[in-house]
Amino acid sequence: MGEALKGLKRTIMCGQLREENINEQHTVMGWVQRKRNLGGLIFIDLRDRDGILQVVFGEEINKEAFEKADTVRSEYCLAVTGKIIKRQAVNENLPTGIVELQGESIKILSESETPPIYIKEDLDAAENIRLKYRYLDLRRPDMQKILKIRHKTAKAVRDFLDKEEFLEVETPMLTKSTPEGARDYLVPSRNYPGMFYALPQSPQLFKQLLMVSGFDKYFQIVKCFRDEDLRANRQPEFTQIDLEMSFVEMDDVIDLNERLIQYVFKNVVGKDIKLPIERMPYKIAMSKYGSDKPDLRFGMEIENLDDVLKETSFKVFKEVIDNGGTVSAIKAENCAGMGRKQIDKLGDFVKTFKAKGLAWIAYKEDEIKSPIAKFLTEEELKSIIDKMDAKVGDLILIVSDAKEKVVQQSLGQLRLHLAKELGLLKDNDELRFVWVTEFPLVSYNEEEDRWEAEHHPFTAPMDEDIQYLDTDPGKVRAKAYDIVLNGEELGGGSIRIHDTKLQEKMFEVLGFTEEKAWERFGFLLEAFKFGPPPHGGLAFGFDRMIMFLSGTENIKDVIAFPKNQNAFCPMTEAPNVVDEVQLDELGIKIKK
């Protein structure tokens, strides 16, 4: 049984002791990282969240403390009191490496079984074991460092937005289900049998209502929930930095959030972000990078070849161009020597994105090697090489298709794939931000034969494009903007519709009947009858921001208690079966 503190107080954290503390008397508390018995001396590395301190016990210093120290094992929780002295052998790898604590008394606050995972940095353990014993995994210094960064980031966000006169307002966790996009997590109501709350996918409607309420500037660091199939860096519950502003246009929102990004990165990790951040229209992002999340850390941009091939007699390209399709290419520098098998693998890769194949031209010193060279004239080959600005040793990779989206997406993904394969991003700690703007307001779902909102139904169209809502909705651009960092979406937002008639028109374009629109969003439409201000906002993915600030590529590392890939918690075993009594109270019967 562990000993009680009985009034004993910790005077300093283990990791805070330095040379200036020599000759001071201190009490430290923490966990045993390691113990070494050298006969008449016992050395214990004691660890707390601030670091590791070496504690030395000697028979001649205090025999009782020495004998008790000999009984401790890894991860025992201790309180040790003694004098800070200079170490004989300095450990330059530790901030506390100049000093040690000479143990005069020791309390074993609790004992520990042999841990199923070793508490160290760079742990090589199966993810499910780490998640099952998460409380041990979180003792590791690298995990504690990440969660400290998370705390510092949240504080920096609050400090900045407070200076900008934003108010932090909490919005409901139990709200109305408005099924659009991802599935809602539903919560049955005991008071209203057969009815359900939904956990919010975002506070979108409430923050707009706060603008109608006259709060002017709102923010919240808030939990959101989506019951969707999990990808590598998705979690069923995640955190957003959510904000909204009244009486603003797009430039105002972008300016505010650029300064927020600059403040956070400088104050949390000391990195300077140059402003203003580059802006790129959606169409340019897609045509040059094949993605609405362009990674600007390397080149290999997509080039369109339609103009140089418009007169070609090569049947494959000619049919595509004549039928309104497109031909585009990327250039892999110094890859002309790539083997046929490697190139064939690249062809298989683009086929996973619906491309029909991959043509290629290797520009070698003594020849131009290509399976399509015999179908092209010398002038066409030269025009392609000139258009791609290819040098001797470069490899040109070409995709053609009737659908521009297939060409853009397949080359965009191939571009990213090659960057990894060629090591273009290795040891690259550059931060390349870009705003992507002028998104399409809606896109056409061919399977369901209807228009869908690209962001959400409350995004305002660009003023000059409103005229196309009735005749050509696909032509309408949105007042939407995403902030992208190194090819990852860090956040997104828009200027909102604040006019009831325009909002009703938007619902009409999306195929909502008036009755359906009022059933789902009547409270918002009703609020818009009472003088709503122009407003807009943005939400950052807080977890993803922490990934960039801490340098980890796994979202589970930035969340204290995450779920696994199957949305299951190995530690608590949630979700779990509940009692029949609880289900009966809710009027729920489980279908077998």
UniProtKB/Swiss-Prot annotation:
GO biological process, one term: aspartyl-tRNA aminoacylation
Region (Aspartate): 204-207
Binding site for ATP: R226, D227, E228, Q235, E489, G541, F542, D543, R544
PROSITE patterns, alphabetized: AA_TRNA_LIGASE_II
A Gene Ontology term for the protein's cellular component: cytoplasm
Organism domain of life: Bacteria
Keywords: Aminoacyl-tRNA synthetase, ATP-binding, Cytoplasm, Ligase, Nucleotide-binding, Protein biosynthesis
Reactions that this protein is recorded to catalyse: tRNA(Asp) + L-aspartate + ATP = L-aspartyl-tRNA(Asp) + AMP + diphosphate
Gene3D superfamilies: Bira Bifunctional Protein, Domain 2, GAD-like domain, Nucleic acid-binding proteins
Location(s) in or outside the cell: Cytoplasm
Pfam families attached to this UniProt entry: GAD, tRNA-synt_2, tRNA_anti-codon
GO molecular function, one term: catalytic activity, acting on a protein
Assigned EC number: 6.1.1.12
Residues annotated to bind L-aspartate: E180, R226, H455, R496
Tagged with keyword Cytoplasm: yes
Keyword Plastid belongs to the record: no
Catalytic class of the enzyme: ligase
InterPro entries: Aa-tRNA-synt_II, aa-tRNA-synth_II, aa-tRNA-synth_II/BPL/LPL, Asp-tRNA-ligase_1, Asp-tRNA-ligase_1_N, Asp/Asn-tRNA-synth_IIb, AspRS_core, GAD-like_sf
Job of this protein: Catalyzes the attachment of L-aspartate to tRNA(Asp) in a two-step reaction: L-aspartate is first activated by ATP to form Asp-AMP and then transferred to the acceptor end of tRNA(Asp).
Self-association state and partner proteins as the record states: Homodimer.
HAMAP family the record matches: Asp_tRNA_synth_type1 (MF_00044)
Family membership noted in the UniProt record: Belongs to the class-II aminoacyl-tRNA synthetase family. Type 1 subfamily.
Protein name as catalogued: Aspartate--tRNA ligase
Organism per entry: Clostridium tetani (strain Massachusetts / E88)
Source taxonomy: Bacteria, Bacillati, Bacillota, Clostridia, Eubacteriales
Encoding gene per record: aspS
